[in-house]
Amino acid sequence: MSPPGSAAGESAGGGGGGGGSGVPEEPMASADEGPAREEQRPIQPSFTKSLCRESHWKCLLLSLLMYGCLGAVAWCHVTTVTRLTFSSAYQGNSLMYHDSPCSNGYVYIPLAFLLMLYAVYLVECWHCQARHELQHRVDVSSVQERVGRMQQATPCIWWKAISYHYVRRTRQVTRYRNGDAYTTTQVYHERVNTHVAEAEFDYARCGVRDVSKTLVGLEGAPATRLRFTKCFSFASVEAENAYLCQRARFFAENEGLDDYMEAREGMHLKNVDFREFMVAFPDPARPPWYACSSAFWAAALLTLSWPLRVLAEYRTAYAHYHVEKLFGLEGPGSASSVGGGLSPSDELLPPLTHRLPRVNTVDSTELEWHIRSNQQLVPSYSEVLLMDLVELGSRCGGPGGSYVPRCRYGGVGGPGAAGVTPHWRSCEHCQRAVSSSSIFSRSALSICASPRAAQGPGASAGCGGSRFSLSRLYGSRRSCLWRSRSGSVNEASCPTEQTRLSSQASMRDNEEDEDEEEAGPPPPYQDALCFPVLIVHRQEGCLGHSHRSLHRHGSCVETSL
């Protein structure tokens, strides 16, 4: 995803006030407070560019057809042909004379086409865009004032979701066949809207400012055609992710309410009467002659509308002005907060609202890239099982470079650890590694290990290659134990790893005894094995062991690694 993405906003469809975005209604800061704006001047097009931009091909086609009909009528009146006739009045003699080729009524055919095309031509002149643009004539000063209001206006990015379904209905219609009327039943489907939801983009945390250009040079042209477009962009990835996250959350909440959902979105400027097209004149009371309505209709009646439009396009300057709002300037990642930390207003807010986590708003493309490269994301449970912790154990000071986990009671996770003085290792990375939670639910795995099983060979097998981590102790009276018998990676043969879950009775039935036990000294290592959950990591060097057996409430489940 490209960091500053931009999207054009629609001007129709209604604003979304139902979302309760909490965006302040005050106007934005003026242009003088921010950095210097880039200037934009109207463009004076050439003749070829004016034709390419707006060719008025409908008017041109109708004009050419009418000129062709007029040419046909003129040809009928000017051209003469020699005719030879035989009549009995002249006693069988032939008569030669010169006459028009359309004397037998053929002249009415081009006249009929001419009248029909002329009517269509006048309708096209009435509905053409050039005539509508002449109705929005404004002076240069009012244009500058309107541009200033749009720059200071508060933007509102809205979303609208319409849930609907189709209902099958019938109605009686009358049809005619061979002059006979008969009634039949017609089946049709009618759309029924069941739910309409609206929301706005809450940009209170990321901030917004106007980055539109300064429009200058309107006084230099006799007429300037202006087109205004609303758009918005993002200055940081966090702001864009906040927008995408809110947008996706809104449409996800309204997606399953009915069979179908119509999604609409756009942006409007609050308290601003937005107009897309305008024509600015230095003096609107005395516009150029080609920009007058009287000249336009006079040329239309004389079938000269297309030449007048081309002349007006050539003599009129053109400017496409973008009202652009930039989001993402007041967040923690902006330039204002890089050097000075958080502002006093930011310190009053909850810490989770300071920054939107990247992993919570990552899109599908970037998520796939993170999964492939295994970077910047917390590894999954299966990935943790395959991690090599030998290097981690050497950094944490294990004996012989091996990884020695420690339980929360202070005992060392190895055979003969009951005599070791209870203490916590100061290595933060080691503590963080051994305090991972189990992926299985404790309600689903309410099977405890018996004391006899804890004293078996599985609990005392202290292979150097055995790797496990201790999860935190839960408050329930039942706990789960993962016991493993695995050989070292350096050995010639690695025995089969058997992972079992055995049930254990409740440690204490009296809550007072539990409180006294927790307040007392740490229990021995063999007793401590019954409390935490041991997540046994399968050896990477063991070949041929691709399945493990899970005994859950007496049933065996084979899971493939």
UniProtKB/Swiss-Prot annotation:
Q: Where is the composition biased (Acidic residues)?
A: 510-519
Biased composition (Polar residues) is annotated at 489-507
Name under which the protein is recorded: Transmembrane protein 151B
Start-end of Gly residues biased regions: 11-22
* Domain of life of the source: Eukaryota
> Is this entry keyworded Heme?
no
Q: Where in the cell is it found?
A: Membrane
Ordered alphabetically, the record's keywords are:
Membrane, Transmembrane, Transmembrane helix
Ranges for the region named Disordered are 1-42, 489-523
